[in-house]
């Protein structure tokens, strides 16, 4: 009986759960992607369920992704965009 519990626990830990979140998708410099090309394609290409154009102060129009995987960076308001 104990073996069954241990095996079940091990399988549960090995499968892992991939979590998702919503947010403004960014590049490696914490700069948002603007709405051209259309956001839905960009977001889906990066594993999100969907994407749309939203307004982010002070960046302006930016791509908002729904259900984006954790390994894809989203806008961190505590860091500025470091372009160029």
From Swiss-Prot:
Keyword Secreted: yes
GO MF, one example: sodium channel inhibitor activity
Protein family according to the UniProt entry: Belongs to the long (4 C-C) scorpion toxin superfamily. Sodium channel inhibitor family. Alpha subfamily.
CC annotations in GO: extracellular region
Superkingdom of origin organism: Eukaryota
Gene source species: Androctonus australis
Pfam families attached to this UniProt entry: Toxin_3
Keywords on record: Disulfide bond, Ion channel impairing toxin, Neurotoxin, Secreted, Signal, Toxin, Voltage-gated sodium channel impairing toxin
SUPFAM superfamilies: Scorpion toxin-like
UniProt name for this protein: Alpha-mammal toxin Aah3
Propeptide: 84
Stretch forming the signal peptide: 1-19
CDD domains noted in UniProt: neurotoxins_LC_scorpion
Record keyword Nucleotide-binding present: no
Main location: secreted
Annotated tissue distribution: Expressed by the venom gland.
Domain notes: Has the structural arrangement of an alpha-helix connected to antiparallel beta-sheets by disulfide bonds (CS-alpha/beta).
Subcellular location field: Secreted
Disulphide-bridged cysteine pairs: 31-81, 35-53, 39-63, 43-65
Cited function: Alpha toxins bind voltage-independently at site-3 of sodium channels (Nav) and inhibit the inactivation of the activated channels, thereby blocking neuronal transmission.
């Amino acid at each position: 009986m104990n073996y069954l519990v241990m095996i079940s626990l091990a399988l549960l830990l090995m499968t892992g759960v991939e979590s998702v979140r919503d947010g403004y998708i960014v590049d490696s410099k914490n700069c948002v992607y603007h709405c051209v090309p259309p956001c839905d394609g960009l977001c889906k290409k990066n594993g999100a369920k969907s994407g749309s154009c939203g307004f982010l102060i002070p960046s302006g129009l930016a791509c908002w992704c729904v259900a984006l995987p954790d390994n894809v960076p989203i806008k961190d308001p505590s860091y500025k965009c470091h372009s160029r």
